[in-house]
């Protein structure tokens, strides 16, 4: 018999936290090193940089659409742990192929195709891992400790992002791009071993024989807070990709104008994004207290407003090497911490235990759609309008969700907004 939530041991929770960090190190390092690899190894020119980088991201996200939906359901059927282990191993295969793409593919077009394939493989692997880690955190929690456990998981994910940009993105300047890319394979293998050794499944198995789209749709249709959570996923998940991809692109391709080396530019961008990760990480405990005191919806509202303000302010930055850029980045960071935690807690609150994987799978599918839309449009805006344009675009999206969250807060204040969420205070 599988252990219940009360029987989950401390070392199993700690393993979940560590794996959350390792998974984000892998995913973030892959995205962060991509512009540097395409520019300096595959020699992709500035004129097409935005489109090429965005297309790579979109291809992987299209794959994730199918992975999230099916594997979320499959995890409800067979458990999360074996999917996590397999995902790490698949990701390791893609991570080995990626730096070898110039030699495997030969000519520049062939090398780019091989790199696309390697990114698809890595995305398939990581797409099998991190949603199941989030679901497992939900499995381990109950109403009394959910905000704490999911916040701790989010804290470790933010720590992984911070580690990449503050430390690991300094490696290309010393050991080279290839060594840095191969590091991702080692991280994946370590993750597979840790998951197999220490994680445990605790959720009840579903009796559904196919992906329960109808059941998920009925849940979302009936619960306004789930609608807000899903809408937040559409916009908020793309925000972190925006910062990781387009800010790095901006620094690397602006470097020639200010006579700064490419590796140095990548390191400067990495330190800035590392600062963002540090702010996200350090503010998550504050958001946890805010959520427990004021509620999930209020956290989404405030987080989206802060992010929107920061993104729009980035539109007024001309030179990314200017110190002014730090202020909007700090606003985005603080906002994203709230947007990262609160919608997931809302989703876990309202998902049946035997369908949690499926509901989170649908939640993540919506996030993929947001990334595909915003990154694709962002790449076009980067190339044809300018580097700040993608940030303004996504800032407007954040404002739209802020307006929806505010409307829901007001409707609940009038007593017509849906049932109470565990841990939420009543809005007087």
From Swiss-Prot:
Gene Ontology biological process: iron ion transport
GO molecular-function terms, A-Z: transmembrane transporter activity
One of the record's GO cellular component terms: magnetosome membrane
Biological role stated in the UniProt entry: Required for correct biomineralization of the magnetosome; probably transports some form of iron. Partially functionally redundant with MamZ.
Organism: Magnetospirillum gryphiswaldense (strain DSM 6361 / JCM 21280 / NBRC 15271 / MSR-1)
Note: This bacteria makes up to 60 cubo-octahedral magnetosomes of about 45 nm in diameter which contain membrane-bound crystals of magnetite (Fe(3)O(4)). Expression of just the minimal mamAB gene cluster (MGMSRv2__2365 to MGMSRv2__2381), including this gene, is sufficient to form a minimal magnetosome chain with small magnetite particles.
Pfam families: MFS_1 (PF07690)
Membrane topology: Multi-pass membrane protein
Reported phenotype of the disruption mutant: Slight decrease in magnetic response, has about 30% fewer magnetosomes which are about 40% smaller than wild-type. Double mamH-mamZ deletion cells have a poor magnetic response and very few wild-type crystals; most cells have flake-like crystals. Deletion of approximately 80 kb of DNA, including this operon, leads to cells that are non-magnetic, lack internal membrane systems, grow poorly, have reduced mobility and take-up and accumulate iron poorly.
Keywords: Biomineralization, Ion transport, Iron, Iron transport, Magnetosome, Membrane, Transmembrane, Transmembrane helix, Transport
TM region positions: 18-38, 54-74, 83-103, 104-124, 149-169, 175-195, 240-260, 271-291, 299-321, 326-348, 355-375, 377-397
Family recorded in the similarity comment: Belongs to the major facilitator superfamily.
InterPro entries named among the record's database cross-references: MFS, MFS_dom, MFS_trans_sf, Tet-R_TetA/multi-R_MdtG-like
The UniProt record lists the keyword Kinase: no
Induction text: The first gene in the probable 17 gene mamAB operon.
Localization, UniProt: Magnetosome membrane
Name assigned to this protein: Magnetosome protein MamH
């Amino acid at each position: 018999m599988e252990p219940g939530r009360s029987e989950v041991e401390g070392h199993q929770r700690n393993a979940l936290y560590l794996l959350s960090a390792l998974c984000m190190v892998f995913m973030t390092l892959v995205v962060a090193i991509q512009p540097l690899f395409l520019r300096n190894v595959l020699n992709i020119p500035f004129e097409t940089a935005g489109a090429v980088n965005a297309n790579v991201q979109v291809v992987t996200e299209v794959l994730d659409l199918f992975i999230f939906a099916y594997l979320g359901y499959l995890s409800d059927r067979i458990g999360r742990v074996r999917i996590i282990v397999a995902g790490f191993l698949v990701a390791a295969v893609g991570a080995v192929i990626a730096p070898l793409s110039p030699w495997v593919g030969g000519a520049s077009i062939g090398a780019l195709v091989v790199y696309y394939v390697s990114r698809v493989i890595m995305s398939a692997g990581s797409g099998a891992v991190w949603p199941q880690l989030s679901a497992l955190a939900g499995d381990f929690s109950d109403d009394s400790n959910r905000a704490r456990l999911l916040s701790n998981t989010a804290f470790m994910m933010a720590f992984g992002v911070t580690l990449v940009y503050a430390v690991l993105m300094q490696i290309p300047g010393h050991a080279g791009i290839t060594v840095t890319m191969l590091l991702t394979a080692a991280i994946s293998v370590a993750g597979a071993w840790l998951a197999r050794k220490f994680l445990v499944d605790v959720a009840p198995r579903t009796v559904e024989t196919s992906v329960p789209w109808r059941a998920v749709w009925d849940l979302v249709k009936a619960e306004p807070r789930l609608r807000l959570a899903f809408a937040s996923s559409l916009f908020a998940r793309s925000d972190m990709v925006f910062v990781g991809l387009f800010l790095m692109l901006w620094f690397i391709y602006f470097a020639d104008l200010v006579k700064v080396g490419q590796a140095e530019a990548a390191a400067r961008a990495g330190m800035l994004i590392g600062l963002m990760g540090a702010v996200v990480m350090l503010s998550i405990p504050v958001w946890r207290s805010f959520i427990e005191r004021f509620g999930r919806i209020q956290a989404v509202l405030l987080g989206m407003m802060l992010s929107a303000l920061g993104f729009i302010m980035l539109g007024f930055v001309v030179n990314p090497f200017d110190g002014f850029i730090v202020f909007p980045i700090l606003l985005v960071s603080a906002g994203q911490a709230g947007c990262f935690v609160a919608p997931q807690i809302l989703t876990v609150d309202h998902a049946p235990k035997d369908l949690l994987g499926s509901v989170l799978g649908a939640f993540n599918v919506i996030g993929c759609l947001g990334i595909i839309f915003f990154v694709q449009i962002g790449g076009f805006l980067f190339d044809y309008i300018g580097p700040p344009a993608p940030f303004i675009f996504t800032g407007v999206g954040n404002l739209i969700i802020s307006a929806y969250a505010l409307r829901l807060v007001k409707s609940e204040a009038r007593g017509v907004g849906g049932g109470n969420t565990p841990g939420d205070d009543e809005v007087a």
